[in-house]
A protein has these predicted regions:
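An N-terminal assembly and electron-transfer interface module characteristic of large anaerobic redox
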Residues: 1-447
Length: 447
């Protein structure tokens, strides 16, 4: 098991039975990637951009080379009910001369142009690796622009080398607080909630909102899927925050609790079990008896309606083996539960940004001998998928080529996908995709 693993990586790979080093100390996580390990993680800047990008009327100016802007251009498949300017990416396109002499003037001109041509009211300015090296003062530029135009121009100091993708999440959360805080007036909307950490991929936010509306809960603000500057500025009025993507938004929930007294709970709307539990927990947290009764009725009806559908596909999937490699721990946990419902054994599971408590739950849910990895690289994924004879890999766009090269089925569960996988509707889409991929006749041609 350890032959092809870098010595520095051994503590980040365990089995559900024992630690890879044999000392039983558990998994090493929440650390910077090992140099030379070819991590699948993205950079700090990317972490910040993916959280802020779905704000529908925000403008994003990337201060750096054009490649940084291209890398994250329209990176999430987020849908909008309003403006779609967020799908644009603006860059200062720094060249060698600008790196030598500084790019502050270019950034100032870029902000001026975005305001003049587009009437921007909210601008995020990102510092990339090059800017971190040459020391352009983006904070001063943003302060001057804010005073000049009387709009929000918010600096996001996110050089890729300054930490992990998780650090980018925190920087994005701090930027969101700068949008919300000026509108805080101490008032509350009783029984209302904010949804944090859902990015409205393929309209998933609207699915979740639909469930909550059916049971009588008002959604105050969504952060950041289908959000706008105006809706974000009402976020401090909510009575409860629910956190879907814990990795990217728990920090924001904690800040809102500390500063404005808004409690939060973590939820997951992936799979029948987690969707039902989340709806019930939200209803109980709101504390209204009528809401709780409606939640119980909704979850029972939806779960029962899916049973015949699941029974149809389960015989084709029982006994198959799955590998999981996703961004956050909450998604991996939900996927394991979904596979358990279908009779599929999870033999390999890893995340890019999972926390110790996530891995503890993953270990409890996993069968004996399951390989658990933090911040895995392609070589490790290949080694353990072949060793465990996985039939399908659930991951993102970077893992797709690896699966196909190994002759393994693949399911895209990352933010590039074009169909909803959340909620009860998402269960149908997920099971159908798993069945189509894992039972495709093409695999018979590879034997």
């Amino acid at each position: 098991m350890t032959a092809d693993i870098l010595e520095e990586r051994k503590k980040s790979i365990i089995s559900s039975d024992f630690c890879c080093q044999g000392d039983g100390s558990g998994i090493s996580c929440e650390k910077e990637s090992v140099s030379g390990a070819v991590s699948q993680r993205a950079c700090v800047y990317c972490g910040a951009r993916v959280v802020l990008n779905p704000i529908t009327d925000a403008f994003h100016i990337i201060h750096g080379p054009i490649g940084c802007s291209s890398y994250t251009w329209d990176i999430r498949g987020s849908l909008t009910s309003g403006s779609d300017v967020f799908r644009n990416s603006f860059s200062t396109d720094l060249k060698e001369r600008d790196i030598i002499f500084g790019g502050t003037k270019i950034l100032e001109a870029a902000v001026d142009e975005v305001v003049a041509k587009h009437g921007a009211k909210l601008i995020f300015v990102y510092a990339t690796c090059i800017v971190g090296v040459i020391g352009d003062d983006i904070e001063a530029v943003c302060r001057a622009a804010t005073e000049k135009y009387k709009i929000l121009v918010i600096p996001v100091k996110a050089p890729g080398f300054s930490g992990t993708k998780s650090q980018g999440y925190k920087l994005a959360c701090d930027a969101i607080m700068k949008v919300i805080a000026p509108a805080y007036d101490g008032s509350k909307i009783p029984g209302s909630i904010n949804i944090l950490g859902d990015y409205n991929l393929s309209g998933e936010m609207w699915i979740i909102e639909g469930y909550l509306k059916k049971i009588g809960i008002k959604v105050n603000a969504t952060i950041t899927g289908d959000a706008s500057m105006q809706t974000l500025q009402t976020a401090s009025k909510a009575s409860l925050n629910i956190v879907q993507c814990a990795g990217s938004s728990t920090y924001l929930a904690k800040r809102m609790e500390e500063e404005w007294g808004i409690p939060f709970i973590k939820v997951s709307f992936f799979g029948v079990e987690d969707t039902s539990n989340s709806i019930l927990r939200v209803a109980q947290a709101v504390g209204n008896k009528e809401v709780i009764a409606k939640a119980e009725e909704l979850t029972q009806t939806e779960s029962a309606g899916l049973q015949s559908f699941l029974d149809k596909y389960k015989p084709r999937l029982v006994g198959k083996k799955a590998a999981i490699y996703v961004g956050g721990g909450f998604k991996a946990i939900s996927l394991i539960r979904q596979f358990n419902e279908l009779g599929i054994e999870t033999v390999v599971v890893g995340t890019q940004t999972g926390q110790k408590e996530d891995y503890d739950i993953i270990r409890q849910l996993s069968n004996s001998g399951t390989i658990i990895m933090d911040d895995a690289n392609p070589s490790e994924l290949e080694t353990f998928m072949k060793e465990k004879k996985a039939d399908i890999l659930v991951g993102g766009v970077k893992e797709r080529p690896l699966a196909y090269k190994l002759g393994i089925a693949f399911c895209d569960h990352n933010h590039e996908r074009k169909h909803a996988l959340a909620g009860y509707e998402g269960v149908r889409n997920f099971v159908e995709e798993i069945n189509l991929s894992i039972n495709s006749p093409v695999w018979d041609l590879l034997d």
